[in-house]
Design a protein with these regions (language model features):
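Short N-terminal segments immediately surrounding and downstream of signal-peptide cleavage
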Residues: 1, 15-31
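N-terminal targeting pre-sequences for secretion and organelle import
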Residues: 113, 154, 159-178
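Sec/Tat signal peptide C-region and signal peptidase I cleavage site
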Residues: 1-13
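Short edge beta-strand segments in beta-sheet-rich domains
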Residues: 81-83, 151, 169-171
């Protein structure tokens, strides 16, 4: 009657494996263990809306007809997570990266500029959110999907961000929930 680890993953409020440092530690070692898939959607959001659940480490692109595409994502680590509503104000393929001043203060070893490419932390695509420094972007660290490790951006595998990028238009509503 032993309860195996696999049975502990249910979405219950008191389960330490659902979120937090333990979940981050366990999820960081999985290689794309969060496959993109079409799932049932019961929310009231209109088709074309992006909904991010930081607690689930998932991004949903609402298709309509009671369906959404679900992606695994990396989210802001403790002290860097946020919630609210933004819209996609710009899209870029293989974006250049300029770390913000706050990040450079924490990490003076970072380059001041990095051209777009496979080594760039923004990955293959970026969708800029409002006038903030936040983005939904690809990543050259796919092993971080499912973890809270970023400085507030929503990161995706490059394969998934290309798929989402092709679906999204400038002006798309983005809702981020905890």
């Amino acid at each position: 009657m032993g309860m195996g680890f696999a049975t502990c993953g249910g979405a219950s409020a008191g389960n330490p494996f659902d979120s937090g440092p333990i979940a981050d530690f366990m999820n960081i070692f999985k290689e794309q263990a969060i496959p993109r898939e079409t799932v049932a959607w019961k929310g009231a959001e209109k088709p074309g809306t992006i909904v991010v659940s930081t607690s689930q480490r998932r991004l949903y692109y609402v298709l309509g007809g009671g369906q959404a595409v679900r992606y695994g994502v990396g989210v802001g680590r403790q002290g860097f997570s946020w919630s609210g509503q933004k819209s996609v104000t710009m899209k870029k393929e293989w974006p250049a990266w300029r770390p913000p001043a706050q990040m450079l203060a924490r990490r003076p070893d970072l380059p001041r500029f990095m051209a777009g490419g496979q080594d760039n932390p923004l990955g293959a695509r970026a969708m800029y959110l409002g006038s903030s420094l936040y983005r939904i972007h690809g990543s050259n660290e796919p092993e971080t999907m499912g973890a809270a490790v970023s400085s507030g951006c929503i990161r995706m595998t490059n394969k998934d961000v290309v798929d989402l990028y092709d679906r999204v238009k400038v002006g798309t509503k983005v809702i981020v929930r905890n």
